[in-house]
Amino acid sequence: ESALYFDPSHGKLREPIIRLMHLCRALNFSSLRTYDWICFKGLEDSILQAPYEQSSVFNFYRPDYGPNGTISDTGLTAPEFQITNDVSSLHLLNFFGVLINDGLIKVGDGLFGTMNYADATLDYSYELNLTYNKEALVDHFDLILCGGRLEDHSKQIILNALNSSHFTNVDMVKYALNLFVHLTEFNILH
């Protein structure tokens, strides 16, 4: 297993919808509405992927796709990069930021939520109990978001960032989460 971790031809970019659902499930994303359903508006237009919106019966992308550059030059494929571009990547990161900081809420362009108030939110109740020990908080997020694969240098960067400012407990949790969704260990599977 450790040999595969260092093999440059092993690994894959996780699909946007998988990363989004992983965050939601890890932090018990739940509806604030009485009828308990959640509507993510405009996913297919912003992150180029949404449930039941694939362009063919086979998937969201061709299995033999390889992006230009090192991956295709070495004869490897990376199908999940077919739906990844500058705009969709930024939309996903912006969506993570809105979801983490405000919950599922309509933003300026009308995407993501359907209301001007939060339809659903992430539950930070467990994580708030870890804010007294920043390392425990980072280790917890490493486990639930990165599967325990967080590199030491990534962990140190996050701890330095958390120690560099005074946060309220909830702001510390949100700040740490915003850092985690940008990590290679969260976005790439080895």
Describe each region flagged by the PLM.
Residues 1-190:
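Flexible, low-complexity segments enriched for small/polar residues
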